[in-house]
A protein has these predicted regions:
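ABC ATP-binding cassette signature C-motif
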Residues: 3-237
Length: 237
């Protein structure tokens, strides 16, 4: 869940170029990603779509050009090939999407305990600590974390899992099903910009329809690579 804090997460792409051994994969690509934009990258295999997505995710550097985004802009990336970690249940692994909330809560508790032991009420450091607790608490309570288990359940059911699957180990599932777990985690984090590389590859029709509805109603920017023309048409129009 993203904090309900108003911010402008516009990303500017300026003059991107990627070359391999003097051969240009693409050059002089410039565009802007605005809040709530839903953009599809389409083209033949080898055109550089996945490479562009990796650059936007910060996973690789271009030969030339730059990507500019606000510091607090959260970008999440689902690559085409990815494996989930073993050692957790399907539900437990998906709930890792909210692990930052537990860390935030622990930090607030730690700072509050420190405040209780301080007596230098007029000092700059005390005021700075008060400000830090206030800011962190505001951010934490602006996130509706109370129903996160319900949201995990909805995402897993939407992506084709059954309730009987929730307590099974992730290692019981094939790569395609494990990719669904990673997709669920990414969606539940509600980043400002979602980068999805062929997200429908391992999904059935019902799960694709659920994903379409989620992306349309999510209200966040999405950039997707997909050969599924119907999916692209549905989410970008």
């Amino acid at each position: 869940f993203a904090p309900q804090i108003i911010k402008n997460c516009m990303i500017s792409i300026d003059g991107l170029a990627v070359e391999f051994g003097g051969t240009a994969l693409f050059s002089d690509i410039s565009f802007v990603i605005n809040e709530k934009d839903r953009i599809a990258l389409m083209g033949k295999n080898g055109a550089g779509k996945s490479t562009l997505l990796k650059i936007l995710a910060g996973a690789r550097q271009p030969t030339r050009g730059k990507v500019s985004a606000p510091k607090d802009c959260v970008v999440a990336y689902l690559p085409q090939h990815l494996m989930t970690e073993d050692g957790r249940t399907v539900f437990g692994e998906t709930a890792q999407a909210f692990s930052h909330l537990h860390e935030m809560e622990a930090q607030i508790e730690k700072l509050n305990k420190e405040l209780e032991t301080r007596t230098d009420y007029e000092s700059d450091s005390y005021m700075a600590l008060i400000e830090e607790v206030s800011s962190l608490s505001e951010k934490f309570y602006s996130i509706d974390a109370t129903n996160y288990e319900e949201d995990v359940e909805k995402a897993l059911l939407g992506l084709g899992f059954t309730r009987g699957d929730f307590q099974r180990q992730t290692s019981d599932f094939s790569g395609g099903w494990r990719m669904r777990i990673e997709l669920a985690k990414l969606l539940l984090q509600k980043p400002d910009v979602l980068l999805l590389d062929e997200p429908t590859n391992h999904l059935d029709i019902e799960s694709i329809q659920w994903l379409e509805d989620f992306l349309i109603n999510n209200g966040k920017a999405v950039i997707v690579i997909s050969h599924d023309r119907k999916f692209v048409d549905n989410i970008t129009t």
